[in-house]
Amino acid sequence: MSITLALSKGRIFEETLPLLKAAGIEVTEDPETSRKLILPTNRPDVRVVLVRATDVPTYVQHGGADLGVVGLDVLLEHGGQGLYQPLDLRIAKCRMSVAVRADFDYAAAVKQGSRIRVATKYVSVARDHFADKGVHVDLIKLYGSMELAPLTGLADAIVDLVSTGSTLKANHLLEVERIMDISSRLVVNQAALKLKREAIRPLIDAFAAAIPQE
């Protein structure tokens, strides 16, 4: 009974490796040097598939993978339908925030009820956040380089992930509101959990025992 785990390259992949090791699983090829999108492990019954971060929930939901590791930001935007979400893995931590140009008075715009143009790739999350606060916004969907939007006049504000804040600072942007803290979650295909329970449940338990403590 084989198990397929969906991961994205980069920080999530690197920070998932110690959790896999705790479960007795080691990826035997480096994704940065290998051209393969399906990576073998030291266990013949476990393989890792490399997909875009935004595609991880879709692969797991539709059975392309049995499990996956995905950021809460992606999961919320996806909606999480058809996914069992047993664990907050507490890795790849950052925050989702609102940021503006240094010369834009965000608080005044909100107070006056002005319509604010906001660029983001997290349209669903941003829409819910501003609706809850009663802030009038026009949302502009972008896929990258969010910091450019206020600098070019495309938007008044952005909603994006922030780790250290250095990128915002380098582009003369100010973080004015924290929407939520973000970390990565383990997601499991619900059908796979039933059909492959004897193989999947020990993995979940091993991950749980290896989660970094606060």
UniProtKB/Swiss-Prot annotation:
It catalyses: 1-(5-phospho-beta-D-ribosyl)-ATP + diphosphate = 5-phospho-alpha-D-ribose 1-diphosphate + ATP. Pathway: Amino-acid biosynthesis; L-histidine biosynthesis; L-histidine from 5-phospho-alpha-D-ribose 1-diphosphate: step 1/9. InterPro entries: ATP_PRibTrfase_cat (IPR013820), ATP_PRibTrfase_CS (IPR018198), ATP_PRibTrfase_HisG (IPR001348), ATP_PRibTrfase_HisG_short (IPR024893). Its main location: cytoplasm. It is an enzyme of class 2 (transferase). Gene3D superfamilies: Periplasmic binding protein-like II. GO terms for molecular function: ATP binding; ATP phosphoribosyltransferase activity. Pfam families: HisG (PF01634). It is found in: Cytoplasm. Belongs to the ATP phosphoribosyltransferase family. Short subfamily. This is ATP phosphoribosyltransferase. The lineage of its organism: Bacteria, Pseudomonadati, Pseudomonadota, Betaproteobacteria, Burkholderiales.
